[in-house]
């Protein structure tokens, strides 16, 4: 029997809009007990918004501390460098038979091109071991090394990511191609589904984290992958609609 224990491996957003704050809020709203292994910290400094990776040994000790917990799903968020990603992958390989959602965060302005390239290669190694990946357009372009300029390009990118080992893919398009509609493409290796909702003129900080953690939550609650993606899309829409100055709000009044 599945437990209600669910893990987020993600970073700390100092303003609590995204990252582990969004993950834990999403888990709680869905009646689940959330755990966190912190991959990085953030702060606003004289250089701007900075990401500080957790020391690799300390990160590994966090995962070791959680090794005996019977998780029913895991969501992977920002893995700031290859060392942290490698330790996360080792941990994931040991968690057999449970859903794993990978939000392949690759776009941090603090990262140099070579670091992004190395992290890209490392994240691709996760693909065979996760249930679904949820890249945005920029991340999908970096992962596939193809330009995405249309809905058809999104579908081709999803197919390519599947051929690279991902079981299920959601390419998040946002309002890139239609200013009034937010379009995402889901692909399971056989069928496409275009997820479509109106664009809200609201703060959407944390939307990507919430989307991935919502998918993970729905999988724990017994939904199929396609059902989980659809439920997560609707949940994120409402979270954006109720957002505040710091990001989306998961625990809005229903």
Task: Please state what every model-predicted region is.
Residues 116-191:
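Conserved phosphate/ATP/ADP-binding segment of small-molecule kinases
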Residues 53, 226-254:
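Charged C-terminal helix
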Residues 15-24, 209-212:
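Short glycine/serine/threonine-rich phosphate/pyrophosphate-binding segments
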Residues 10-15, 192-205:
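Short pre-catalytic strand/loop immediately N-terminal to key active-site residues, enriched for Gly-Thr
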Residues 2-8, 20-107, 254:
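Conserved N-terminal subdomain of the carbohydrate kinase-like
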Residues 77, 91-118, 125, 129-137, ...:
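Juxtamembrane transmembrane-helix boundary motif
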Residues 141-142, 201-225:
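Short, small-residue alpha-helix embedded
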Residues 31-33, 192, 218-232:
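Phosphate-handling active-site elements
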């Amino acid at each position: 029997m599945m437990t209600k224990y669910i893990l987020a491996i993600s970073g700390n957003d100092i303003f609590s809009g995204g990252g582990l704050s969004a993950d834990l809020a999403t888990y709680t709203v869905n009646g689940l007990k959330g755990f966190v292994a912190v991959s990085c910290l953030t702060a606003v400094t004289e250089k701007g918004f900075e990401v500080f990776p957790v020391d690799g040994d300390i990160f590994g000790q966090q995962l070791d501390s959680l090794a005996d917990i019977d998780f029913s799903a895991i969501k992977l968020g920002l893995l700031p460098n290859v060392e942290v990603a490698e330790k996360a992958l080792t941990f994931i390989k040991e968690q057999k038979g449970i859903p794993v959602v990978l939000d392949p965060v690759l776009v941090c302005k603090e990262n140099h091109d070579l670091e992004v390239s190395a992290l890209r290669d490392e994240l691709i190694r996760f693909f065979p071991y996760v249930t679904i990946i949820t890249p945005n357009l920029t991340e999908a372009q970096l992962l596939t090394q193809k330009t995405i300029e249309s809905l058809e390009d999104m579908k081709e990118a999803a197919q390519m990511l599947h051929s690279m080992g991902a079981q299920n893919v959601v390419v998040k398009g946002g309002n890139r191609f239609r200013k009034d509609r937010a379009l995402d493409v889901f692909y399971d290796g056989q069928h496409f589904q275009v997820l479509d909702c109106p664009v809200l003129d609201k703060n959407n900080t944390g939307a990507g984290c919430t989307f991935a953690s919502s998918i993970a939550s729905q999988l724990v609650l017994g939904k199929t992958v396609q059902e989980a993606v659809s439920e997560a899309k609707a949940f994120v829409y409402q979270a954006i609609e109720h957002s505040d100055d710091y990001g989306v709000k998961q625990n809005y009044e229903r």
